[in-house]
Amino acid sequence: MHKVELKEVGLDIGLAFAKHFYKTDYLHYGYWTKGLTVEPANVFEAQENYANFLLEHFPKGVTSVLDVGCGSGKFAEKMLDAGFKVDCVSPSPNLTKHVKARIGNRSEIFECRYEDLSTNKSYDLILCSESFQYLLLEKAMDKTQSILNDKGHLLICDFFQRNVSGKSPVSGGHKIERFLNYMKTQPFTQIIDKDITRETSPSLDIMRDLIQEVIFPTWNIMAYYMTSNYPRFSRLFSFVFRKKIAQAHRKYFSGGTSGEQFAHFKTYRLFLYQKNN
């Protein structure tokens, strides 16, 4: 049986919230340009900005793309509509259902982790849009080398950990210094390195408001109901899951998940690398 990881559940819940509150199927951050007010009504526009930003950085001559960690398949659909040949890697069974419903047989969908991918195909571009943080660096780069065409490209758009003290309320991301040093040892040439932390960090302010105004009050109401009606079960539940509950409070309910905090601990970058012959 497939073991469900917490991050997988989080992405599926995130998609449900995105559809209901923001009328979007994208799962990535928004790209908040100057003049675009940071408010829920503009989330979809910011995410479209992000999607277009990615497309603008596709190198000339690219026709085939592997979308690693394709989320709901929304951006894969956008690439297909733009004329690219696109295949997808989708390790989450729940999200894969959304991908299949969206793009059908227009793409081959590999239902596995990227590191475990087995295929005879090769691609002009490997795209990791907010999926690189979940990959095992060394194994992922070995896989990338093996399935990229000669002089093919790797496009990464994701956040990384800064070398600062303290603990970020937003987990995830490779350490930026380790990543950059490791890539210097790989048969790749860096073409682009763009810091878009300022443009993406406002997405955390949107997330914070949703948590504080909707999710946290709902959590408190449910907790009040359970402790009032099922006190013994509630005490047992609170004891068994005390570490997870404390983690949820620290990460989500403390109010620290803000754009300012994100920008302090993380750096959001777009990297374009070309494979050497």
Task: Give residue ranges: language-model regions.
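N-terminal, positively charged/glycine-rich alpha-helical extensions of SAM-dependent methyltransferases
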Residues: 1-34
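Conserved alpha-helix/loop element of class I SAM-dependent methyltransferases that forms part
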Residues: 44-61
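Class I SAM-dependent methyltransferase SAM/SAH-binding core
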Residues: 66-116
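A short acidic, Gly/Pro-enriched loop at the edge of an enzyme's catalytic core
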Residues: 116-126
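A short SAM/SAH-binding and catalytic strip from SAM-dependent methyltransferases
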Residues: 125-138
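A short glycine-rich, Lys/Arg-flanked "PGG" loop and its adjoining helix->strand segment in the class I
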Residues: 139-153
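Substrate-binding/catalytic lobe of Class I Rossmann-like enzymes that use SAM or dcSAM, i.e.
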Residues: 167-258
